[in-house]
Amino acid sequence: MKSLRALLTTALSILTLQRTATVTGATVDMANFASNKAVFVPGVLTDGVHTPSVTESDAAASGFTAVAAADLDGALAVLASNVPQSVGYIGSKRYLRLVITTTGGPATGLNAGAHVEQGNSRKIP
């Protein structure tokens, strides 16, 4: 058996916290990686509707738009308690931001976070 530790990197986008409002994650630069997977990790959901999505841009600070379904390997659904979801990104933009859109005016919401797993580094140490 072989370890993937040296072959993969994890870039945190959304810190795991209790969510009662929409959150847009930190920008993730994909310049040095040929493979990227967005991972949403929900904990206990008490109320509200929490929908994950992936946005992309050519610029680090602006111009983010929703990733087209054709540029995702897989699909995302409304988050449920303790059910992680992931999609591969096969688009051509350099930057990603993960988003959890919250509706329904939750009182306590959802404990959730998200990250991007990156592999196939273009720069091997």
Residue positions per predicted region:
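Short secondary-structure boundary segments
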Residues: 1-12, 45-47, 51-52, 95
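C-terminal interaction-tip segments
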Residues: 1-12, 102-125
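Long, hydrophobic N-terminal alpha-helical segment
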Residues: 2-41
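Coiled-coil-like amphipathic alpha-helices with heptad-repeat character
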Residues: 14, 89-92, 117
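Surface-exposed ligand/attachment interfaces on beta-rich extracellular proteins
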Residues: 17-31, 44-69, 76-83, 106-107
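Noncatalytic modules at the cell exterior or secretory-pathway interfaces
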Residues: 34-39, 89-107
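Generic structural motif
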Residues: 52, 98, 112-114
